Structures are given as C-alpha cells and as structure tokens.
C-alpha cells in the first residue's frame, strides 16, 4: 500500500482510507494452490529465477504466472502413483515414483510429479534423481543402429556372447536363435542389444543419446546398451519425444506467460526450440517396433486402446523400474524405485507398476485427441519365420547349442498381475505380429489442449538388467 502511494498509483485520500480498513484475505480456489502440483511449482519457481524474476514479489502475489500444466492429467498422475504403489505393496516412505509428460509438438510440460508425497520429501525425482533406466535405454541403441542402415527386419543372433570381459545374458537365460531385430526389441533381448552396440560402436550410441538431449555423463562402455548408466527422467523423456514427432528434439517448457497484478504481460514464452536429430525413417521404424512392445511384448499392461509405443525397463535386482512411452501428441516417462536404492520385490518390473501408472495417466492426458494416428510412412514388420534376411547381425560359423528357433517367449517375463488391476485383453496378447504402423495417409491430430485453465502459480519444479 505504501509503495502504491509513493509511486502515485493512489491519492493521499485513498491511502489514508485504505489504512483504516481491515485486511480481508482473499479466498483462493484450491485449484490455484501449490498443493496439487508442488514439484511442478518448485520447477516453475526455479525457471522464473532464471528469467530474472524476484522470488519475494512472486510469492507475495506480485505476478500472475500462467503455466502449461494439464491439471486433469496431473491429478490423474498423483492418484495413479499412490494407487499403484499401494496396490503392489509399495506403501513405505522409501518407495517412490515419478511421472513426467510433455508435448512432443510444442514442448508444453503437461504432468510433473517428482514424488508421491511432497510434504515428506521435496526431493525432485524428475530433474534431480539420476537412476539407471535398464532396458528402456535400448531404443537409443536401436535408433543408432537404424541410423546406420540396420532394418527392423534384419535378422540378429539371440544367443550368448562375450565382449571383452563382459558376458551379458538374457533374463531367465532364454535364447531364440536367429530372430528379426524388431522381435529382439519387443521381447527385450539383452544379448541382441549387446550385439547391436558392438555392431554400431559405443561412440555412435553415446552420440545418439547426446543429440536426443541426454546430458548426464555416459560411460564409454558396452554395458550402457542395457541401461547401466543413470539418467534423469526429464532428459530421458525428452529423448523419447524424437520418436514421436519424426526425429525432432523439442525443449520442454513450463511457463506460458507472466503478468503483473495489473494484467500487463511482462514475459511470454518464446518460440519452442526444436532441432532435427533423427531421420523420419528412423523415427517411423522405432515407433513401429515399440508399438509391438505394447501390443505383444513386455509392455502389454500399458495398452490404452489407441496408437501408442513404448519400452519397459528394469534394472539390477529390481532396484529401478521404468516405462517410457508416447502417442503422437504426448510423451510420458514413469520411474518407480526406492530412494535408498534398495531392492524391490521381483514382481516390480517395467511392465507392471510403471506401465500401469503410465496407462492411468495417458488415458486421461490423451482424451482431447481421440485415437490420433502417427503421421509416418508405412513400415512393414515381416511376420516372424517369414523373413528372408539381407544380413544376420552377429552371425558366425559356430552354431548355437539350440539350432531350432524357440517360440517367442518374453525374456522380461511379465509377472502375473493382481486380479484387481489386471485388465489386459487376452486376445490382444495372442495376436500375431503384424505391421503396427498406420497407413501413410494417417495424420497427427494437433488440436489444442481442452483441459482446465492453466495453473497460475501464486507462490513462487548389469546382472539381470532388463
């Protein structure tokens, strides 16, 4: 009030009269408070500070900050985390999960859950935690291979190998002989991922990770093919965005605009930074392959009944579990684990709790877009057993102990889901592998978010690797 008087916004008479009046606190609807998206609000505050805004003035109501948050999807994420963690016996304080969603088209951050309970832990598992992604890193390896000319229909040896002193093994020690590359990703074969990184080189894989926006240091080691190196959920989800939009890396952002208390716009988000890093063909091939992960592979629990692609990831002794996936309009990454890095029970894998959380979030987040199709050239995935390969990756004169190819059996075995949460269509699981990519005429739906109003911020974001 004094500042308003000194700056001549009000007269002496108005100033004296206002001093005599009692202060009445404005009732702010709960929707506009930070308790519904506290981790996101912390992130926004940090972004505002980078832009040069004063924290005190923001927290005291000096500015109105309009954000990109999709509150309906955020609410679904908050509820999905609690429901699925408790449903799978992960109700302890150390048991945690994080969810991050953004638009691969314009970069808007839609969901930001850095943990299950902000009042007990303000540690942000979206931007601060560095946790190994397990097999959900394999698409980075496969993308590097696609960029080098390897095809989803090329054959690859799914049998044990040794690279130097490293001898990766498949989950359950199950091997299938010669299989198509797309099948290797669908069943999450560890040895096939190892063969691919050996084929294209560690440097190519690291370079692919870098151009896709993964900034966390990566070790120059073959084991990164199985996700042994930690990453941040924010940057990892950003990397998956390039598979969704034709190979473009889009920088996620949270702040649409900032207004003064008098309605003057003092900041407006600039045009989203977009760089083209993967070929359209590679993005189309990766999407076709990762669709099979959800329809026929290790990620069946994530099936939302509309075009979507993704990858499961589970690390050593089930310490970390991921599900990374996307539709044409939204990319979502989910991590589940313990803050103290201790072992979770064996049923907690990428295809269980993370996939179920992802499904719950995406069913809500994708509502405005219906069954949007990927706008990609058609990619034909030749049915298993019908491939006449141009080459076999990892082929040698020595024959594997089992000459005959086994029937496809998931190496990242999907544990039996509790009956209360098991919703997977049995017929969908038995579907033969076929082309999973829509016809070329399909188009990406890009209609704007029809969700609740943007949220103003009143204050103030290798053993058994699968």
Question: What is each PLM-predicted segment?
Answer:
Residues 167-170, 201-238, 247, 251-254:
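Mid-domain, small-residue-enriched loop/turn segments at the edges of structured enzyme/sensor domains
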């Amino acid at each position: 009030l004094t500042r308003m008087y000194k700056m001549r916004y009000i007269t002496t008479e108005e100033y004296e009269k206002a001093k005599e009046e009692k202060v009445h606190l404005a009732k702010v609807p709960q929707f506009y408070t930070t308790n519904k998206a506290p981790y996101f609000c912390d992130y926004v505050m940090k972004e505002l500070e980078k832009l040069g805004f004063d924290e005190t003035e923001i927290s005291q109501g000096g500015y109105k900050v309009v954000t990109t948050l999709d509150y309906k999807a955020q609410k679904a994420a908050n509820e999905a985390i609690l429901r699925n963690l408790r449903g799978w016996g992960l109700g302890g304080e150390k048991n945690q999960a994080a969810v991050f969603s953004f638009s691969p088209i314009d970069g808007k951050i839609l969901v930001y859950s850095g943990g299950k309970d902000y009042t007990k832990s303000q540690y942000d598992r979206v931007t601060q935690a560095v946790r190994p992604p397990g097999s959900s890193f394999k698409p980075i390896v496969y993308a590097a291979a696609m960029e080098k000319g390897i095809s989803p229909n090329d054959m690859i040896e799914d049998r044990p190998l040794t690279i130097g002193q490293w001898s990766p093994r498949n989950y359950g020690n199950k091997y299938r002989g010669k299989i198509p590359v797309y099948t290797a990703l669908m069943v999450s074969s560890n040895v096939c991922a190892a063969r691919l990184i050996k084929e294209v080189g560690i440097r190519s894989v690291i370079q692919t990770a870098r151009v896709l926006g993964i900034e966390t240091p990566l070790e120059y080691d073959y084991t990164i093919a199985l996700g042994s190196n930690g990453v941040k959920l924010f940057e990892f989800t950003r990397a998956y965005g390039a598979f969704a939009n034709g190979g473009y890396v889009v920088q996620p952002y949270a702040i649409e605009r900032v207004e003064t208390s008098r309605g003057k716009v003092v900041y407006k988000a600039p045009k989203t930074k977009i760089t083209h890093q993967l070929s359209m063909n590679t993005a189309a091939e990766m999407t076709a392959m990762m669709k099979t992960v959800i329809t026929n592979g290790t990620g069946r629990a994530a099936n939302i009944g509309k075009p979507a692609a993704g990858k499961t990831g589970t690390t050593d002794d089930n310490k970390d579990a991921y599900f990374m996936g996307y539709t044409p309009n939204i990319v979502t990454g989910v991590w589940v684990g313990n803050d103290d890095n201790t072992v979770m029970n064996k049923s907690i894998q990428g295809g269980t709790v993370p996939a179920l959380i992802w499904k719950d979030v995406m069913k809500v987040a994708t509502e405005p877009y219906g069954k949007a199709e990927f706008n990609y050239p058609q990619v034909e995935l030749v049915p298993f057993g019908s491939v006449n390969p141009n080459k076999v990756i990892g082929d040698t004169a020595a024959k594997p102990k089992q000459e005959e190819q086994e029937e496809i059996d998931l190496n990242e075995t999907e544990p039996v889901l509790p009956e209360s949460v098991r919703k997977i269509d049995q017929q969908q699981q038995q579907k033969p592998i076929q082309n999973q990519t829509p016809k070329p005429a399909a188009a990406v739906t890009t209609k704007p978010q029809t969700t609740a109003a943007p949220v103003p911020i009143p204050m103030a974001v290798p053993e058994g690797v699968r």
